[in-house]
Structure formats: C-alpha cells, structure tokens
C-alpha cells in the first residue's frame, strides 16, 4: 500500500531571496539534521541569463533503524538523488528527491516547493508531498512503512526550524536582505526594501478562501498537530473536495473533528462526514440558528443554558437534569422537538467555540457540559424518556464528534448508576473518558473540586458559588400544556403515540382487578414501573411472596392471594401501600427486589366507581449486575405528568 505525506503550507515571514540564501547554508551538512551525512553536487547548470538553475545532488543519509534490522538488510546508509529547479524570475524553487538505495524494492518520491507568498511578496511559502511504496522488503514491508513515515515526519518537522536558524545566522553576519534577480541593467529594479506586514488583525494568510491550510492557521485555530496529522488533514480536505462537487466543503475545524473521531483514518472519516453532510442538508441544519423558534414550554421549564466559560476557555453549558420533567417535556413538545432543541444547542456551541477562539487567542474546538443531578430519581428512568435520550445521543455522536471537551457530573445520587449503565453504552469511548463525577452534595470544598475546572467567580450559586445564572430551575410541567389528543376518539387507545408496543392497555370494570405476576431469580435487581391512568380512579399496590404463583387470566374479580391458605403478613407481604391514582395522573416508581421470590403488581378499579377504568402500564427489571445494589429501595412517586392523552 502506498503511504502518502502531504504538508500544510509553511510560511516564512521573509522574502524569497533571503530564504534561498538560508536554504543553501544547509548543504552539504548541518548539525540540525544529523541524519544527513553528506550531499555531493553531481550536476549544476544555469540558464536564461542566470535566472534559472538546476542542481542535482547525491545525498547520503544514515539509516535510523534498530541495530538488528540494519544487520538483516545489510546497510547503515542510504542514498537519495535530489534535483532542485530554481527560477529567480518567478521566485520559485521546486525540489524532487528519489531513493537510489533499494530502488527495486522501495519507491520514495518527494516533491517540495518554495515560492513567494501570493498575497505578500515579502513572505515565502513552502509545501511538500511525499509517497512511500514498499514493494518487497524481506518480509518487513509493514514495519518499514511505519518506520519510514515516522522518520520522514520527524525530519520534515525540523525543516522550518533549520531555515529560521540560518536566517538568524545571516542576520548575525549583517545580511538581512538579498536583492531580487533582475534581467539586465536597463530593467527597472524591483522593490528591494524589506516590508514589515502586520497580520494581527487579519485572518491568517492563504485561508481567506478556506481552501489552503497554513501553519499560522493551524497554530491559531486548530492547535498542535503532528506532521502526520497535518498531512492527513490536508489529504482529507482534498478527498472531500473531490467527492463533494456541488456542496460546500466544511472548514478545517470540522474536518479535524471528524478525523479525530475516526482516529485519523481518512476513509472512515470521509464516510462519517458524507453521511453527516447529507443529514444536515435533509434536516436544514445550516438554517437552524436563524429559523429555530423556542417553544414556550421549553422557555419556561427547560433547565439548561450557556454560562460563561470553563478555565480552559471552553463555552460552558449547564443542564440541571435532576430538575427536568422528562415526561412532561416529551408530552408537551414531543421527542422530535427535544431533538431539535438539542441540535440548536449544538449549533450554538459551534458558534461559541469560534467566538472563544478569538476571545482567548487560542484554539477552542470543544465545549464543557456541567450536569447537575440533584433531584434525579427513578422518574427520570421513564423508558420513553430514556429512549428519546438515546436517540439524541446517537444523533449528536454521529454529527457533532469531538465537540465535548469535558463533562462534569455533579451531585450524583445513588440512583445515577442505573441511568449511567443504560446510557453509557451508547456514548463513544473517547467521550466517556471525558466524564468527571462528583457524588456528594458539596462539589466545591473537596480535592479536585469544581474550582479546578470553572473559575471561582463563575461557579453557579445553586452549587455553592457566587454567580447568579439565568438558567430556569425547571420543575413539573402543568398538564394543560400537554399536546391535546382525545383518547376516546381512538377506542380508548392512544393513537399513534411514540410508545406504542412498549406500554400495555388494561380496561377494568368497577371491582375488577389486574395482577401482574413477576418471578424474580435475581436478588438486588430493581423493579420499575410507570402507570398512566386514562379513565376513573385506580388503586395500585405491590406485594411479595415466597410461593410460586402463576399469572391468572380467569376471575379478574379476585386476587391470586384470595386462596384460603394465603394470609397477609404471613404468606405474603404488601411492599407498597395501596395508592389511589386519579384520572390523567401518572405514577412512576421502583423497588429493589432484595430477595428472590414472586412479586405482584396489582391494579384495581374501586367498586364505588360509576364506570369502567382504563390504564396503561410499563414495567422493567434492571439487572443487579448493572445496578450493583446502589440503593436499598425507592418509593413510588406521583407527578402531574398526567396522560391528558398521548
């Protein structure tokens, strides 16, 4: 397989002629490049009245490889042929180099170019491309590829430093300017004075059209990259340009994020990015910042918002998840609207990262998320809510990779391991490594507390800091804000709601009951339930017995405990007192099944009701292996998240 290296544009803030004088000082050897043992000129010719010069050198390089490897291949040095094409009239130097040693087994080709900056004639640009094709190398092809590209990237990294070094040496000798070439005495001389140009208030050179990558841009907007990473980024850009003929090509920050997400595999990153670009076009994501209208319910009850920056300059988003009425939000705005809200936040994050880069004068290419879990309970594990969360996570992971720099989880209660077990499997491993957890109520006055990550004066007051936030506290959403839809219109079954197939519907006549028998063989597992009452009152209770009971489908006016040999307190125990659930009311709860046995969920329509009752229920058992007994028991919880209709 051919390995390719392609550099970004390097810029020397010196005229081309001075850079050429420094370049010549490299030969035949220089201490900054010890791998080059000698360079012998084998041909040197000038043409066009001295404007053009072609120089051919035979370069002797030390083989930087393990001793045993050098013994196997039988050489300590390698020879390369380098040909330079200098054109002083056009102010360009083109360099080509090929290997002479092992040329039948290995093909190494390098092409470099020095040229006058197209926008500032007193600056000089440099770029290079190299390929390595190992055909047959004693069975060491893969090792040779890795070693060759590693060594090549190390030497190219020194190239700019060497030119800068020799320019400084020239200055010490009193040479700070070299005249431009001129054709004859009658030709008007070109300007020779060195011009100092400030670009502090401009965009980086050569990037105004967002197509050419230069070193200054990398330092300002992308951060430190290895030569191979820079090369991958340049190649990735070209690949996207070739495959995305009609659409615009994303900026380098976006390209780099997708490359990082796929461990700098160009093919994998390209596939991921193309799918994301298609998704953005289909859902008009580029217009979301200008077109999105925040629903009234979100404005009043969504407990999240942007809040200054963390200590590294990242935009900080705070989400008070423990105060979020997940069920209420889903019923009032729907899953699609919650996803759209999340995408709007992500797009805001991209914009704020660019603003932070300019504000702090350094690359900011991700943001920080602080999640306050105070108030988190089993009601947050409502399965449709978790399902919506997983959909949101999946969408964000696919389309906004590497935007999360750090996630601070504060005031995590004992129930949090349950949610984390469910959710973490859907989060990229690299993203999971950025999570920091603070379990106690005080996340400030502890070792490695929040003050290590957020400026003291910006820590929110609800976490013990002094900064007042504009973030809503959340709370339960009134049921009159839920989307209206008549249950009766659809024969009592919620029509087309997003949880169809997950919940089961039960109709009960006055005095009738429904019992769900659960045989538990997993001590310390957790039984969770969610109930929505559609019509009339319902009585709910939870029981446990050691007896092996079977699900009854016959006389629904009697209980499985009505046998003569079953006595409450002796043969079975009531774990949850009877709770009266009102119409359009939701009940969520859970119980740790500490021991094996039979558990019975019971719903009953009181005999005093003047008509039949209807409910929908869902239950789930969370394995003890995942839950790990982090809580002794959780009580049923009421919410006004009533089922006005689904």
Curated annotation (Swiss-Prot):
The keyword Translocase does not apply. Residues 499-646 form the GOLD domain. It comes from the Eukaryota. Residues 2-175 form the PRELI/MSF1 domain. Its main location: mitochondrion. GO terms for cellular component: mitochondrion. CDD domains: SEC14. Keywords: Mitochondrion. This is Protein real-time. It comes from Aedes aegypti.
